[in-house]
Amino acid sequence: GMATVGSYYSSGYGNMPYEEFTLTLTKIARASQPSINTYPGNSPDITAGTACTIHMNKQANFTHKVSYWFGNKKGTIATGVVDNCSWTPPTSLLDQIPNASTGSGTISVETYSGSTKIGETKSCGFTLHLPNNSEPTIGTITLTEQHAGVKAKNANVTVQQISKKLVSVPVSAKYSASIKTVTCDGVTLSNNNGTYTGYISNKSNGTYKITATDSRGLQSSNAAEQTFYEYDKPFITAALKRESETSAEGTLSVNGPY
């Protein structure tokens, strides 16, 4: 740029201008400061599997090398970038946060004039979010009747107080999470190579609700429905009444609903 400089000398009459001249100043090259999605300010929230834009905010005709660092993973996004570049954070990065829904990372930019690096490497932070629908996947729920009587009549119904079902359902977590618990109507099911099983009885309805929770705390639910039949087990009341206090004989009365 240009600057006007004045030179003064002192006399008994005060400071008097002596000479005025113009200097041409050399422009100092500065490294570019990156930002995400907006510029010059940074908008750090991005989603795995969704493209974002990384702005260079350059001050001269420079090119740039853009890199990322997330957890123990790092890599080059692009080289020779002039103004901006697009980056889709791979979902494979999510194996760095198996127990969290977000994680922090860094975008780094090296600035070049030709092959000469300008200044220090500049960076900006980002917060990586899970994609939508990252909850556990619940497969087909299988209900197998264990009571011989119900099974003989119709194994695909639930009979109050009698039915006992073996519940079996495949469940899997997404994006490097692990399954923490799987329940059916509040009863914890056991894991057998990704298929969760358990026995459910004493039902008051025909709905079998599966709830799966992963290591990130994300939940999903699904349910199987069966026709439900109310049923009360038969019972009787019996009373024996002597004919007299000394009699060896009496009357037995038996009653019960059916």
Where are these regions (language model features)?
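Short, compositionally biased P/S/T/A/G/V-rich stretches that sit at domain boundaries
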Residues: 26-51, 131-160, 228-249
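Edge beta-strands of extracellular beta-sandwich domains
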Residues: 17-24, 116-129, 218-228
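Short beta-strand segments within Ig-like beta-sandwich modules, predominantly Fibronectin type-III
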Residues: 76-85, 186-194
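Exposed low-complexity, polar/acidic, P/S/T/G-rich flexible segments that act as propeptides
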Residues: 8-33, 133
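Surface-exposed, short loops/turns at beta-strand junctions within beta-sandwich domains
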Residues: 1, 91-105, 118, 197-206
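Conserved structural position at the C-terminal beta-strand
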Residues: 109-111, 212-214
